Regions:
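Cyclophilin-like peptidyl-prolyl cis-trans isomerases
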Residues: 2, 13-204
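Bacterial N-terminal signal peptides that target proteins for export
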Residues: 1-9
Length: 204
């Protein structure tokens, strides 16, 4: 009897979680599973289409990259740099801050996307137009990074997980969720990414 009751509770809880995912507002999301828990990120695909196309293409394995053994670029990588009360950084296949996908692309700065609080998703770089696969998520506002690093999303659930991540923790998977027609239409392939990359380079 107790076992049956427990199974019922588990099924009801799973149903609530599924409903929560289905009830997200229209948008493009990345569900990042870590060994500390899940981080749900909303991606700014309309304001920073190139940067989001890069992230989505790497996550889904639909654009070419230099990491061998896994088409889904981020799965299994570690948070190689964590600074308390600042940010967590991942996306480096080498795990030492020097790795990337084998290419770089231009910055995308939008006036309404700022490093204005906790949970900002932004690109790590080595200077102008050196974006690749490394990203960071903030613990606090970091306004000195505005105009130097491309903001392309924000945590909508799981900031407590961001705050719990420690250096060396693992990104177990990144899965993209599309809600609504605009997000559904944002399908990334190599041709789309190349076009956006060329257009951004020509605007510099």
């Amino acid at each position: 009897m107790a076992r049956r009751f427990l199974c019922t509770i588990i099924l009801l809880f799973a149903g609530v979680l599924t409903l929560s995912a289905q009830s997200l507002p229209d948008g493009l999301y990345a569900r990042m599973q870590t060994n500390r828990g899940t981080i749900l990120l909303e991606l700014e695909f309309e304001r920073t289409p190139l940067t989001v196309a890069n992230f989505v293409g790497l996550a889904e394995g639909t654009i070419s990259h230099s990491r061998s053994g896994s088409p889904r670029f981020f799965d299994g990588l570690r948070f190689h740099r964590v600074i308390a009360d600042f940010m967590i950084q991942g996306g480096d296949p080498l795990g030492n801050g020097t790795g990337g996908p084998g290419y770089t692309f231009a910055d995308e700065f939008h006036p309404q996307l700022r490093h204005d609080g906790p949970g900002v998703l932004s690109m790590a770089n080595r200077g102008p137009a050196t974006n690749g696969s490394q990203f960071f998520i903030t613990h606090v506002a970091t306004p000195w990074l505005n105009g130097a690093h491309t903001v392309f999303g924000r945590v909508v659930e799981g900031q407590n997980v961001v705050d719990a991540v420690r250096q060396g923790d693992t990104i177990q998977s990144v899965r993209i969720e599309r809600v609504g027609p605009a997000a559904e239409a944002f399908q990334v392939d190599q041709q789309m990414f190349n076009r956006l990359r060329t257009e951004a380079a020509e605007r510099r």
